[in-house]
Each structure stands twice: as structure tokens, then as C-alpha cells.
Design a protein with these regions (language model features):
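Glycine- and small hydrophobic-enriched segments that form the cores of compact globular domains
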Residues: 85-91, 115-135
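Alpha-helical transmembrane segments of multipass membrane proteins
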Residues: 19-22, 62, 66, 70, ...
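Transmembrane helix-loop-helix hairpins at the membrane interface
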Residues: 124-279
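Residue-level signature of transmembrane alpha-helical entry/exit and packing/kink sites
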Residues: 10-14, 51, 55, 59, ...
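C-terminal halves and exits of single transmembrane alpha-helices
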Residues: 85-109, 139-150, 155
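Hydrophobic alpha-helical transmembrane segments and immediately flanking/interface helices
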Residues: 76-100, 163-183
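Transmembrane alpha-helix/helix-exit interface in multi-pass inner-membrane proteins
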Residues: 102-125, 156-163
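N-terminal, membrane-interfacial amphipathic/helix-forming hydrophobic leader that caps
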Residues: 1-95, 235-279
């Protein structure tokens, strides 16, 4: 664990952070995009479930592992960054806390109620190229839930704790640390296209605000997981009734979906290449 008073600490953090970011951005710009294109060609649920399972395991290992390594190095900067931000009086005020609570409650009601109200709609707006991620039968729903919960956990630990703390340890600037972490979070959604990148940055800003105002990373994890569960579980169940489909060939639902799952996927392109297979 690096000490904030050690003059070598910023340099060590900078080397570690730059190396990690370069690797992750290269993966996102090359492997993620190519694999996602191939994933969209898969038609059998067996292959889709295998890919979902691989994404869950790889994401947990990669992003969870990076979080552990970075937090081991920069853990002492986590409370320092939070304390710096909360010196802004309105951020830590009880009134802001109440407003946040109200916004979260109303947001949850609108998120769920909007899906229920849209059951009869013929078209649901979407942000980013995310339709292929929708579960298409009961078995795939389980992987949708696993992806959502895993993303909520490892992505919040990485992009709301580990990365901002490391950047703060390098720059001693809370604004730079927060803004850079949000941008990195968005860029790692390259496979969703420009709309997906922008949408992910906006979501990252929301999750960051929840963490900074509440002071609780657990709350940010829960909200992130809830949002992804809405996209990858609730929408397929309510709009497409996929929970009633025991078997399936993996064909896409007839109607487009809504929402941007905030899921970053580590990938293995070679294993994702589809081959002809009977449904």
C-alpha cells in the first residue's frame, strides 16, 4: 500500500495506471468490437450462453483483479479523494442527501413503471448497439442477471474507487480524477458505438454522483446492478416474455429494446467465432 507522503508514489501509480488503461483500451477498440460483431451472428442459445458465461468469468477475473491490485496500491487515497470532494458544502449537506434519496426512489418507480406501461408499444428506443445482449429464453435470463450483478460489483469498484483514487494520487486534483474516470468508463464501451459511449459516460457520471453524495460505494453498486437488471432481465421478461421460453434458437426478439446495459466485457475473439450448428 503506497503512502501519500512518499514522493515516489505518484510515479508508481502513473506507471501502473497508464499500463492498465492502454491494455484495456486496446482490448475495447479491437477485441471487444470484433467479438461483439461475431456474437451478433450467433443463432443457437447454446453458443450464446457459453459466451455469456465466458464474459461473466473474464469480467470478474479481469476487472475484479485490476480493482484489487489498484486498491492495494492506492487504498489510502480513496478516503482522501472523498474527503476532498465533500469539502464542497452542498455535496455533503443533509438536504442533498434527501434529494438524492428522493431522486433514487422516483427513478426506480419510473424505470419499472415505464417498462410496464410500454408493454403494448411496438417500438422501444435504445441507446447504443445493445440489442444482441438481450436474453432470449429462460436459461439466458440467468446469465443476464449474472452479467448485471457482476458489472455492478466490479465496475463500481474499478471506476468509482480504484481508478479515481489512483488518478487523484497522481494529480492531487479531485475534478481531474473524477472526470478522467468517467471518460475511461465510456471509452471501454466502444463495442456499443458512439451513442453507447456517450450513454455510458452519462451513466458513469450518475453512478459517480451517487457515490460521492452518499459516501457509500455499496449504494452505487446496488444502483448500477439494478439498472443492468432492468435492461437484461426485466425488459426481456415484461416486453418479450422470454421467461416462458424453455428452449430457443437464439433468434432476436421481434421488437428492439431500451436502455444501455453498463456492462464492459473482456473478450477472447478466437473462441467467439461462430460455426454452423443446428438449432
Amino acid at each position: 500500500m503506497l503512502s501519500p507522503t512518499n514522493p515516489a508514489t505518484p510515479w508508481i501509480l502513473a506507471i501502473a495506471l497508464v499500463a492498465l488503461i492502454v491494455v484495456m483500451v486496446i482490448r475495447a477498440s479491437r477485441k471487444d468490437k470484433r467479438e461483439y460483431r461475431r456474437f451478433k451472428m450467433l443463432r443457437t442459445t447454446k453458443r450464446r450462453q457459453a459466451m455469456f458465461r465466458r464474459w461473466v468469468l473474464q469480467s470478474f477475473a479481469l476487472f475484479g483483479g485490476v480493482s484489487v491490485v489498484l486498491l492495494f496500491l492506492d487504498a489510502q487515497f480513496v478516503p482522501l479523494l472523498l474527503a476532498e470532494v465533500r469539502t464542497v458544502e452542498w455535496i455533503a449537506s443533509p438536504i442533498t442527501q434527501l434529494i438524492l434519496a428522493g431522486v433514487l426512489v422516483v427513478g426506480a418507480i419510473v424505470a419499472v413503471g415505464g417498462i410496464i406501461a410500454a408493454r403494448s408499444e411496438t417500438e422501444i428506443p435504445s441507446i447504443g448497439d445493445v440489442q444482441a445482449l438481450l436474453p432470449r429464453n429462460r436459461a439466458e435470463l440467468r446469465w443476464g442477471a449474472a452479467l448485471s450483478i457482476n458489472a455492478g460489483l466490479v465496475e463500481e469498484l474499478l471506476f468509482r474507487l480504484a481508478f479515481p483514487a489512483a488518478i487523484f494520487g497522481i494529480t492531487a486534483n479531485a475534478i481531474v480524477a473524477i472526470a478522467a474516470s468517467i471518460v475511461i468508463f465510456g471509452l471501454l464501451h466502444l463495442y456499443q458505438g458512439v451513442p453507447g459511449i456517450v450513454g455510458s459516460m452519462l451513466l458513469g457520471a450518475v453512478f459517480m454522483a451517487i457515490y460521492l453524495i452518499s459516501g457509500s460505494i455499496l449504494l452505487a453498486i446496488v444502483i448500477h446492478a439494478f439498472f443492468d437488471l432492468r435492461s437484461l432481465v426485466l425488459i426481456p421478461i415484461v416486453l418479450f416474455k422470454v421467461h416462458l421460453v424453455r428452449q430457443g434458437n437464439g433468434l432476436a426478439p421481434k421488437r428492439p429494446t431500451a436502455a444501455v446495459p453498463a456492462v464492459v466485457k473482456p473478450v477472447d475473439v478466437a473462441e467467439a467465432t461462430p460455426t454452423p450448428e443446428a438449432p
